[in-house]
Amino acid sequence: MVKIISDSTCDLSQEVLERYDIDIIPLHIVKGDEELEDGPQIDIHALYEWADKNKTTPKTSAPSIETAMNVMRPYIDEGREIICFSISSEMSTSINVIRMAAEELDAEDKVTVIDSRNLSTGIGLLVVEAAVMAADGKSREEIKTGIDELIPKVRASFVVDTLVYLYRGGRCNAVSALIGGALALHPMIVVKDGKMDASRKYRGKIGKVIKNYAKDLEEDLKNARPDRVFITHSECDARTVEEVRDYIASLGIFKEIIETRAGGVISSHCGPGTLGVLFIAK
């Protein structure tokens, strides 16, 4: 069976990773002189406290080649083929590191590296689809073809409580135009062509903004594939998250609504109070 691997920016929970037998290659987070591997052990609240205290955003970087090799090696040694997903190449060099790791293992003919053109559970949606296909006995080529068809259909967006983290991180150029005197704005950030861009803008308290954002997605949600939808957030109010879940459930579209928390890398760039609804269009 083809082994499915992703870098850590897919933001899939440990339960989902175990259910679908997915392995993770961690990116790195740098807080001053301290370097951490992205993963469930990262204390997101402490990450934000450090950022606010130091008035800066943690730096993030691609995995090391050694780490990527160590994750892939056992499966190569077993003679298995691998499909490995990376965050959009427009946002990180993670994909290059994974490709170099495959070369170092002399396994280019056994490893397919896919540029998700996305982030967070926008990647996670593709990773889970690939894992389902692998479990169904599909070949590496068949999985790659299926995923290539799905990549442009992924709908990834989120709203943020503060523009500061996106601005400091420099990953969304549109935020620079909003930052001057517009800190009360809560933009809807969408992933398009592998990059982040600002879409519609909301004003008001973040709890109300998040609920309006979810309702504004209704027509798109009605045209989504019904298998699953992700609600992914970072340090969001639990009641607000539950209200979004209840609203999506009330539409009666999805077989599964999966709540996940954004990992360390994604949280470092989006900031606290961020929530996204991510799905695949039909």
Where are these regions (language model features)?
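Class I S-adenosyl-L-methionine
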Residues: 35-104
